[in-house]
A protein has these predicted regions:
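Non-catalytic structural scaffold of enzyme domains
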Residues: 1-170
Length: 170
């Protein structure tokens, strides 16, 4: 399931194919099915705390991919992993949770304390941070509220719209 904004989806698709090309060489590219949603609909559901409807949307996407012949489901967005359990229960093929390879890389790098940046949902709720802490015994730090609000704003009002402002990098 693609990133929620097409901006992130395009980036992930490029990285996936560059990785395949680098590994296999030549003209190789990823064999993949991608289901993209209308982020305006997703953002409305998130903002209005309509997570049951958001789960239905993600479950529908996962089932469509499964029917299309996908071998597994990857959800290319941190925030929507709030709905990971619903997605995983809805399909027979494996669902690969984004926090697992993230944690494995963190551990490989010899780290045990990390800072988590993301949307307000990702930073403040337990669905992502809790998995890192409980399953991988990592200490996860999040910014203070004012910083979380700023990061959330930058993600939604800039990055999801394809804007990368120099001032926001600081």
């Amino acid at each position: 399931i693609a990133g929620m904004s097409w901006e992130s989806s395009a980036h992930y698709y490029r990285l996936l194919n560059e990785g395949i090309r680098d590994r296999l060489g030549g003209f190789h590219s990823a064999k993949c099915l991608m289901y993209s949603v209308d982020f305006a609909e997703v953002e409305t559901l998130q903002r209005e705390n309509r997570w049951v409807e958001a789960a239905e949307m993600m479950v529908d996407a996962a089932r469509r991919l499964e029917r299309g012949g996908a071998d597994c489901i990857i959800l290319c967005t941190n925030t929507m992993h709030k709905l990971a359990d619903s997605i995983e229960r809805s399909v027979r093929i494996p669902f690969l949770h984004i926090a697992d390879p993230t944690a494995e890389r963190i551990i490989t790098e010899g780290l045990d304390t990390i800072a988590l940046l993301g949307t307000r949902f990702t930073m403040e709720e337990d669905f992502y941070r809790g998995r890192l802490e409980d399953k991988y015994d990592l200490k996860v730090l999040i910014p203070e509220k004012a910083e979380r609000d700023l990061i959330h704003h930058v993600i939604y009002d800039e990055l999801c719209l394809g804007q990368i402002r120099e001032a926001s990098r600081d």
